[in-house]
């Protein structure tokens, strides 16, 4: 058996960073949607609960339907709770939530990218590229692996394999950062160095060997 290559002292324990987008880099402001829900007598979070039910969200994450068609699915899910007009307003408000990028996270990732490839790996709609452009982040990563473009949704092992291949790095030499425990566990099971993101400090600690 061929021994694993010896790595120089001080070299980082990974050769690529694979990073989620939503709730790591990008954060949404739901206050407008919450106000609409209150105005029509719905409990806060009802629209999101309907929208992100697996059977409703999966088609848009796989790129099989557009965000606008997703709104129609949300309207169907809200039937009986509010009027059709109100349901459409709620669905539209959800897909148009304002968002921002976390400057600290972006800065950390840009610094890391000077040392190793950076790949964004995200469950997203076909709107992702336009959203990254709106945030001024089209050039943030070397590659973007979006579920809607590749037809694979985390935690499917194949999306991690694809991301590592895009980076040109073995799975066990990748750092993976995500805010969803299920995705972190799936990545770890494949041998990736997986980090469950809660705040920017988690990312800074994980990237410390590069910074």
List each model region and its residues.
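Short, acidic loop-to-helix structural element flanking the phosphoryl-transfer center
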Residues: 85-119, 157, 200
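Asp-based, Mg2+/Mn2+-dependent phosphohydrolase catalytic module
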Residues: 1-15, 19, 125-211
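Short, surface-exposed acidic
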Residues: 40-51, 79-92, 171, 211
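Helix N-cap/beta->alpha junction signal
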Residues: 29, 102, 124-125, 180
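Alpha-helical substrate-recognition element adjacent to the catalytic core
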Residues: 37-75
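Active-site neighborhood of HAD-like aspartate-dependent phosphohydrolases
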Residues: 2-52
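Metal-dependent phosphoesterase signature
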Residues: 60-103
């Amino acid at each position: 058996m061929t021994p694993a290559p010896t790595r120089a002292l001080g070299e980082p324990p990974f050769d690529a960073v694979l990073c989620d987008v939503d709730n790591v880099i990008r954060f949404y402001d739901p206050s407008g949607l919450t106000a609409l829900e209150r105005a029509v007598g719905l409990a806060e979070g009802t629209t999101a609960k309907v929208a992100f039910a697996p059977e409703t969200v999966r088609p848009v994450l796989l790129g099989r339907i557009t965000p606008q068609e997703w709104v129609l699915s949300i309207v169907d899910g809200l039937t009986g709770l509010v009027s059709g007009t109100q349901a459409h307003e709620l669905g539209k408000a959800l897909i148009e939530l304002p968002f921002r990028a976390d400057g600290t996270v972006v800065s950390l990732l840009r610094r890391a990218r000077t040392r190793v490839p950076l790949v964004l790996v995200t469950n997203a709609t076909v709107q992702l590229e336009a959203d990254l452009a709106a945030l001024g982040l089209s050039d943030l990563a070397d590659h973007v692996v979006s579920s809607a473009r590749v037809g694979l949704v985390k935690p499917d092992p194949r999306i991690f394999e694809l991301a590592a291949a895009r980076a040109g790095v073995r799975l066990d030499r990748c750092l993976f950062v995500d805010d969803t425990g299920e995705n972190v566990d799936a990545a770890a099971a494949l041998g990736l160095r997986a980090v469950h993101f809660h705040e920017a400090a988690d990312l800074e600690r994980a990237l410390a060997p590069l910074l």
